[in-house]
Amino acid sequence: MKRLLFLLLFALAPAAFAATPPVALFYMTSNPNSIRDFFAHSSQIDLLVPTWYSVDQNGLVTGEPEPAVLSRAQEEKIPVMPIVALFNKKAFHQLATSAEAQARMNEALVRACRLHGYTGFQFDLENVDYLDRDNLSALVKTTADALHAAGLQLSIATVPNAPGYPGADGFAKWIYTDWRGAYDLAALAKSADLICLMTYDQNTRWTTPGPVAGWQWTLDNMNYALQFVPKEKLSLGIPLYGYHWYTGAPIVTPATIPDAAPTEKPNPTADYISYPDAMQLAHDWDGKLQWDADDRSAWFYFYRDQEREWVFFTDLHTFQDRYQLAQQNGLEGFCSWVLGEEDPAIWNFLPRHGQASAGR
């Protein structure tokens, strides 16, 4: 009987381990909807990453916490790891090539952590030129060393960059040189405590209509990242929002030659849209909600002014599939942009914090 019980427990152990909830990291902005969402669902958030800080080319860190948010997080023992952001190519290059500016930044980050009780900071450094790849890795190491010396942590949000090289067309080259090519995942993983892989924005205003994070695209980028990043350091990005594509007014450029006709170009465009706003749009225009089984994404279309408009968005089903992907692959967790934009049904699915795999 004892032997049978032992064998049964042994057989169930892998399933129990696989079922361990991934760490739930949520981003929060200063938008009132985002803040209200945090207060409503703080018991299901394992790590809060608010967009409170930025840094400039001189290493000047600016920002401050939302007092009520910080107080609630401390009451519930939710680690707070604010973003420190920089999205400017030239400014980043100046910061990354100045030891003085980096020292100023790192001193400010450590000071803010000690003053407010943060567990550390998360770098959100985007629009970085691919030629600054080594500079980015070196900057992250310098900051990680400074924070680690103070008993703090550093994470970094990275643009997904599979397959690791540019494609053939002009857009593929641009997205690599201006967005994807700067992130050396192997080097970053050696320095940072956590890599938040931003597996979203596959399709945006720059592209034709499509899922925010298609299934195969998400798999490709996760598997590529796992070649360089230990799974216990990787958090999978899950978007909570969508995009609404429609036809904009043609762009008319006046002729530079006398008597010549102006140049006209088409202007398809897309707007960022939250789940509640997407549902309102579907209701108002009789959009038929659909499920893309290949991309595992929710979407719909409708007609306005005799033209078709598309919306791809994240519903509970879309969220669950990606959550389970992180769980089944034993990743550290998932990171979702952004509180206040989501399908409220996800809160009926997510466990309370403290049940995730990481110690609290």
Residue ranges, per PLM feature:
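Glycan-binding loop/region signatures in secreted carbohydrate-active enzymes
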Residues: 240-324, 346, 354-359
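Sec-dependent N-terminal signal peptides
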Residues: 4-13
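Short, acidic/polar
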Residues: 28-42, 97-114, 176-188, 313-327
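A cross-domain feature marking catalytic cores of carbohydrate-active enzymes
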Residues: 27, 52, 82-86, 125-127, ...
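Conserved, mostly hydrophobic/aromatic
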Residues: 48, 123, 195, 236, ...
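Conserved, well-ordered alpha-helix/loop/beta-strand core segments that scaffold catalytic motifs
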Residues: 318-336, 341-342
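Substrate-binding surface in catalytic domains of secreted glycosidases
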Residues: 58, 129-278
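Glycan-recognition patch characteristic of GH18 chitinases/ENGases
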Residues: 19-108
